[in-house]
Amino acid sequence: MTKDLLDVSVDKAVDSPAPKGAEAKVHHHKNGKKVFHNPWPSWHDLDPEAVKAHLKQRKWMSTWTHPSTAEAKIPFQTPTLSRERFSNGTSDVRATWLGHACYFVEFPSGLRVLFDPVMTDRCSPSQWFGPRRFTQLPCAVKDIPFLDAVVISHNHYDHLSHPTVVEIAKLHPKAHFFVPLGNESWFHASGITDVTELDWWEGADLTLSSPGQSDRKIEPIRARITCLPAQHTTGRAPWGTDKTLWASWSVASPPPDQSGTGNTVASVFFGGDTGYRAVPTLDAQDDDWDEKYADLPVCPAFEQIGELYGPFTLGLLPIGAYEPRALMAPIHANPRDAVEIFIDTQCKRALAMHWGTWVLGDEDVREPPQRLEEALAFKGLARKGVFDVCGLGEVIRIPL
């Protein structure tokens, strides 16, 4: 892990494109206990009492379900990660799904980025209780040869793991963490100081270069990492709700304004954990994408992201944990929502995530990929080769 360590520098003085009015920072809560909020009509707050009442009603009406994982036959393989930083030999982006929202991405420039790593059995405050992984972890932190940047979407336990980030900092001491606003102090308390904290529509330039004493000199590897909006919530305890920000991210290497002649930019949009539109409680036979619900507002941020930062080489987009729909829709996209986000953000290709690892919703654990194919067909898109589901540990090559 520690061979071929490159010096890392981060510059936050970056002029990042932002939509009109972004300087008002309307997602910053001005009053009350919360620090941040979702500022769009596509959101409605999750009322804890309403959630309790809904779950109680479902229990008494015998509609409570806990999905079985017995038949969850998700393809698995040990990932083949490049052992040489520049051994790719092509201009492909290589993306490897490590479970749930964790992807390891190898850029043609030599950059290596890990998104939302949770490499523990459970996603909870303790490894003694909480949701338990029902599929095998493809690899451990020690199996990752190079790691330059770790990008975190938010602080929920299925996206931010204390044991995992501490191990990363130990085994990859020069890896730099990029986090949404309000999370830096948590990392410092965990003994991790190589952290850059960003607000929505803020970016930073990452530069990797050969150490001064190194005999092997390389051209600097450059990337621009930009914090972008998502529709979600945060909190690692009941008293910490929405006191830190949640985000999606753009990673482009090299930065678009520094690509130079002959250097093609590889760009990845990481959706993190996000909803797309709040929906009402429906009758069992209804679909919230039926024509009669066409006026329900959608989150406008994704279209803004596509206009300002697209097209993206690759999108990493969530497709699971969407049932019960009326409760989950504000915070978790279902496959139909995910296809809309794919289109809004102008991703050329996409890979699915946020499914197949922990039971976090009521849907059948095998259902998200099936519904994704249906959603693609509904929009007139190919079922394969556009927005795909990959196996655990599978390395997918995306040409530029």
Curated annotation (Swiss-Prot):
One matching Pfam family: Lactamase_B_2
Coiled coil: none
Highest rank taxon of the organism: Eukaryota
GO MF entries: N-acylphosphatidylethanolamine-specific phospholipase D activity; zinc ion binding
Biased composition (Basic and acidic residues): 1-14
Expression induction or repression: Expression is positively regulated by the leucinostatins biosynthesis cluster-specific transcription regulator lcsF.
Region (Disordered): 1-31
Record bears the keyword Hydrolase: yes
Keywords from the named record: Hydrolase
GO cellular component terms, A-Z: cytoplasm
Enzyme's top EC category: hydrolase
This protein's pathway: Secondary metabolite biosynthesis
Biological process (GO), any one: secondary metabolite biosynthetic process
EC number, UniProt record: 3.-.-.-
Protein family: Belongs to the UPF0173 family.
Protein role: Metal-dependent hydrolase; part of the gene cluster that mediates the biosynthesis of the lipopeptide antibiotics leucinostatins that show extensive biological activities, including antimalarial, antiviral, antibacterial, antifungal, and antitumor activities, as well as phytotoxic.
Name used for this protein in its record: Metal-dependent hydrolase lscR
Species in which this protein is naturally found: Purpureocillium lilacinum (Paecilomyces lilacinus)
Name of the gene: lcsR
